[in-house]
């Protein structure tokens, strides 16, 4: 049985261990910079004969620093921290494929936003 909340929890723990404020829902008093665990998408994996699920979790990085440096640095730290697949395991489920999907850094209304997509497969 797949438990999406356990993966979100493991990602939350990983991000907070890096020293970032991490939210599912951003409180009004949130201080920049912070990371939001955004949309979660999942589907049955194609081309597999066993019970495999592909999961994508979007991370949103928000900063009011002038320029992209802070968002770039946070994005780099997150990418480097997820190099070890074992850190994202949750319960009995086996994580066997991990990568970063579409990602971007943009300026929106004076605030810099980085968007990182974590793609992984579990069975």
Residue ranges and their predicted role:
Residues 36:
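Conserved beta-strand in the GNAT
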Residues 1-29, 39-123:
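Charged, amphipathic alpha-helical segments and their flanking helix caps
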Residues 33:
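A solvent-exposed, acidic/Ser-Thr-rich amphipathic alpha-helical stretch
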């Amino acid at each position: 049985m797949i438990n999406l909340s356990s993966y979100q929890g493991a990602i939350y723990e990983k991000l907070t261990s890096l020293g970032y404020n991490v939210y599912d829902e951003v409180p009004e008093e949130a201080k920049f910079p912070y990371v939001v665990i955004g949309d979660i998408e999942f589907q049955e994996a194609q081309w597999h004969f066993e019970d495999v699920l592909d999961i994508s979790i979007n991370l949103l990085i928000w900063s009011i620093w002038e320029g992209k440096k802070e968002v770039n640095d946070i994005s780099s730290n997150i990418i480097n921290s997820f190099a070890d697949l074992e850190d994202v395991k949750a319960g009995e489920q086996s994580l066997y494929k991990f990568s970063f999907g579409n990602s971007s850094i943009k300026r929106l209304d004076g605030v810099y936003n980085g968007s990182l997509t974590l793609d992984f497969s579990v069975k």
